Amino acid sequence: MCIRDSLFSILTLIGGLALFLYGMNAMGDGLAKVSGGKLEKILENLTSNPIKAVLLGAGVTAVIQSSSATTVMVVGFVNSGIMKLSQAVGVIMGANIGTTITSWILSLTGIQSDNFIIQMFKPTSFSPVLAIIGVIFILFINDSKKKDIGSIFIGFAILMYGMDMMSSAVKPLAEVPEFTNLLLKFSNPLLGVIAGALLTAVIQSSSASVGILQALCLTGAVPFSAAIPIIMGQNIGTCITAILSAIGAKKNAKRAAAVHLYFNLIGTVIFMTVFYLINAVVGFSFFHQAATPAGIAVIHSVFNVTATIILLPFAKGLEKLACLTIRDKKEDVVVSAEDREFMILEPRFLEKPAFAVEQSRNAARKMAEESHNALFTALSLVDKYSEEGVERVENMESKVDRYEDELGTYLVKLSHKDISEADSHSLSIMLHCIGDFERISDHAVNIMESAQELYEKGLKFSENAKKDLEVLGQAVEDIVNTAYEVFDKQDMKLAEKIEPLEEVIDELSKEVKRRHVQRLRNGECTIEMGFILSDITTCLERVADHCSNIGVCVTQVNEDLYDTHSHLNIVKSHPDETFYHELEDARIKYQLS
């Protein structure tokens, strides 16, 4: 083999590897978008049953085609407090089993038969068809879900084409003595493990490194004696991704990464010790035979399943070993309940955008709940003042401010990721609405301060003023609850109730102020009380305006329209029957006595 041919083979091998990795990444991204964060949600809600944890870890990894992605997610779950370390152990073991599905798919490249039906199972036969379907889905179908499915098909086709390129590039190497001698050196268990670990650590994908090994096997120059230790090393090397992810994380997250490493290290030691002892006594007939892609898949699966069966009963021991390695320190900061609440905005989840969007929704719901509670706690202080209530409102408003800051920053980072059309809509709605939630909590503080002023000055509203405020407060509670439900469910039909109700609240606010002026003329009220009443009604009116913003935002984003003022002008200047009907219902429901 001349230098020119060798150089061409190396370039083809590198090019094939590049296509292989790109295809795997494209397929993984497509699968993640199609799942819409549901797989990660399943992991998040798993029970403490270790067998169920293993099965879930295997299932999720088999679908997303990456044990590294699963373990990084697990590190993120543990770091955010969503998952306990004890739960993580089973998922990590399952992830190792789930990743073997890729090697079984890639083993199809080794099919050798003249039978037409069997030939159709060979990836080179059906990959072009998948590529054509994928292109049609992406270019000619205007549906984001179909486009994501198209990405999966094209990713798979590119992956298989890359695998075929690698196989073609290494086939001539079988005739090069130096190459075959190099592979034989990996029959030394230690060298084989190191080689497999280094290769996987560099490309950070055990599936890809196993694929490379399967491509090399097609030369017929890789004996099982070399393939077995390389596979063991590949399982160890894949731990680097979780270890890197755990840098800067909390202790338990680092322990989760340590569990992954210990599982593969201990599993490798046990498997290789038993295997080589039996081989020394019995002598496996296949040991010095040329490995095949299917043989690689079998070894990969047998190792991971066997290691899980052996070590699952000792899951607590792995957990303790990780805790002994990464010890608690006296000076370790205890995480407060509030800080734990914000851990759902885990930076590691940004690598799984669909799940990060779902976590952002959860945070936005909690933010909305806090602003809702702050508002109606503040309103209750007008009639029944308490210092405890004041403190609660201040704490809730402070938490809402923090949500706006941290969630807003998180959403901006998330907006730079590749997300589906549906998630993009959700992201836009959240970015628009968190400002309204924050302003509602600010109005809650203003109402609380008005209640404080009433209490400190020994003032009380008249019974008529109280009744007026009660009706206005009920209308505002109705619009706030409706707006928050519209935000949560993105319910376009329910959003139609908001604008008529907002108009009624404007009418009520004006009427409450007019009635106060009348009472002032009759000597039933004071100017000072009037200022406080006006402040409270104005705040409630502003709250209704923010609810209107939320309703309009949900409607506009879902219709791909972003001109809020034009939308409101059209709704109010050209109201339809639904608007009139809702308006009359609200007027009847909220009447001042």
Report each predicted region and the residues it spans:
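Membrane-embedded alpha-helical segments and adjacent helix-loop junctions characteristic
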Residues: 15-73, 114-120, 143, 147-218
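C-terminal ends of transmembrane helices
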Residues: 24-33, 74-81, 133-147, 242-248
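The feature identifies polytopic integral membrane transport proteins across all domains of life
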Residues: 41, 51-59, 82-92, 117-118, ...
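Membrane-embedded alpha-helical segments of transport systems
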Residues: 63-70, 89-106, 123-130, 159, ...
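Membrane-interfacial helix-loop connectors
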Residues: 73-95, 103-125, 163, 200-237, ...
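Cytosolic, long alpha-helical scaffolding segments
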Residues: 83, 109, 222, 248-254, ...
